[in-house]
Regions:
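Amphipathic alpha-helical scaffolding segments comprising HEAT/armadillo-like alpha-solenoid repeats
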Residues: 10-24, 41-55, 74-86, 107-108
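Acidic (E/D-rich), amphipathic helical modules within compact regulatory domains
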Residues: 26-33, 37
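N-terminal leader/linker segments that initiate helical-solenoid repeat arrays
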Residues: 1-13
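Eukaryotic acidic, Ser/Thr-rich intrinsically disordered low-complexity regions
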Residues: 86, 93-108
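Short inter-helical turns and helix N-cap capping residues of alpha-solenoid HEAT/ARM repeat scaffolds
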Residues: 26-27, 57-58, 89-90
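Core register positions within helices of long alpha-helical scaffolds
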Residues: 6-9, 37, 68-71, 75, ...
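Conserved hydrophobic register position within alpha-solenoid helical repeats
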Residues: 3-6, 34, 65, 97
C-alpha cells in the first residue's frame, strides 16, 4: 500500500498519530494529503500540529495547514490564524487563512 492510500485508511480509522507522522514526509504530495487528513480526522494534537505548519517555508504547506485548521473546526485556532494573517506575505496563504477563519465562525 502506498503512502497516499495509507493516509486515506488513517483518515477513515481516525489514526491521528499516523497522519501526524506523514505531515513531515519528504514527498510534498504526501505531506499535503496528510495535512488534509489531519484536518478531517484529527483529534487531540491536530490543532497544535497544523499551527506549527503555518510556519513552514513552503507557502503551499502553509495554505494547506490553514485550510485543514478550518476543516478541523477547533476554536483554539482562531487567534493564531488571525495572528498569522497579520504577518503572512503570500496572498494565497492569506486567502486560505481567511477561509479557515470563516469556517471557524460557521461560514464554511
Amino acid at each position: 500500500m502506498g503512502k497516499l492510500e495509507k493516509i486515506e485508511k488513517c483518515v477513515q480509522k481516525g489514526k491521528e498519530d499516523e497522519l501526524v507522522k506523514l505531515v513531515h514526509d519528504r514527498d510534498k504530495n504526501v505531506r499535503l494529503a496528510a495535512i488534509a487528513g489531519v484536518g478531517r480526522a484529527g483529534k487531540d494534537n491536530a490543532c497544535n500540529v497544523l499551527i506549527t505548519l503555518l510556519l513552514d517555508d513552503d507557502p503551499e504547506i502553509r495554505s494547506a495547514s490553514a485550510s485543514a485548521l478550518g476543516d478541523l473546526g477547533d476554536p483554539r485556532a482562531h487567534t493564531l490564524l488571525m495572528h498569522h494573517l497579520g504577518v503572512e506575505k503570500d496572498e494565497r496563504v492569506a486567502a486560505s487563512i481567511k477561509d479557515a477563519v470563516g469556517k471557524l465562525h460557521g461560514g464554511g
